[in-house]
Amino acid sequence: MKKILIVLYSIFLSFTASSYEFNNKKEYEIEKRNISNVPKVMHFFSFFCPYCYELEKIYNIQSLIKNKIDKKIKIQTYHVNFLGGEFSKILTKIWIIAQKMKVEEKIMMPIFKEIQENNTISHTSNIKNIFLQKTGINKDQYNKFWNSFTIKMLIKKNDNDINKIKLNHVPTMIVNGKYVIDYYKLEKIFKTNFSKKYIKLIKFLLSKK
């Protein structure tokens, strides 16, 4: 009888752990406004944000989301323009070009490092040189994308989506157009196994309506 009780108790503990639900106003908050026609997972950052750099350097957020979330889920990473002045718009354009060419993981950390540690990027030519060097893309391909009407439209969509959110700080994630994840708060809550808990939280919010 005692052995049966122990087994049942173990099953109960296992079920409790696996069925744990994250809490509103703790691991996430609910956006009051209705945000429609946006990707399921929206991740916002800036190359001018020191904390964005630290998160990416420690946890490899971009790759983590891409590899651990179901490929059928629409995920979009946005570079915001409200940090870094006018040059921020250049970086937004570079980021969108990188996404279109599927080389964003090759340029993300190099650009972060040059801005946050080396302070070597201050002109369009600087960023172009880094892009070409790290991706192996030739100048003609780069210039074609730089002057592309498609890129202009994607920049407009990028800015429109950000305006819908009325975002004023990064890094931030929004899931299903309403669940807001604040990384500052999250890192304090997830003191251990951040990556695992972070992905679990995203999947939990994706399952909510």
Curated annotation (Swiss-Prot):
Involved in disulfide-bond formation. Acts by transferring its disulfide bond to other proteins. Residues 1-19 form the signal peptide. Belongs to the thioredoxin family. DsbA subfamily. This is Thiol:disulfide interchange protein DsbA. Disulfide bonds join C49-C52. The lineage of its organism: Bacteria, Pseudomonadati, Pseudomonadota, Gammaproteobacteria, Enterobacterales. It holds the Pfam family DSBA. GO terms for molecular function: oxidoreductase activity. The keyword Disulfide bond applies. PROSITE patterns: THIOREDOXIN_1 (PS00194). Keywords: Disulfide bond, Redox-active center, Signal.
